[in-house]
């Protein structure tokens, strides 16, 4: 093909991947790629499920105005040793968040989706909410990431319940990521 492309070894799925940027009509490149053995087209739902399995936070879900990097367990990437940067003072005052990101794994086929409330078993007051959730094709179980109150003493193995369309569904807190491909 006589077409310029920008090929980036990037992605947001936890898998090896490439992003191809094309000026103009990408259809010939698309057809060439699909003709290769092992290449399958997929959509954004596939990308988002892989992101969730890899435990990667996404802005608008696990990151945003309501959640700091500390809430998303990303405090280690902030360099407070730098003299000054935009937001440094605000981040210094947010080192101890009220909510923190946890991984949840369930059983069966009922996945807790974004904004579903999370409860301690038998309790009526929500302790947080799901930020991302799906049925994991890789693990064959429902998984979710949730922002939960840090003052509840939750740890890996703790049991919680998700309100899935009016029914309490049991989940256990698990270590993130849910899945990491062997390299």
Give the location of each predicted region.
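Conserved, structured C-terminal
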Residues: 1-183
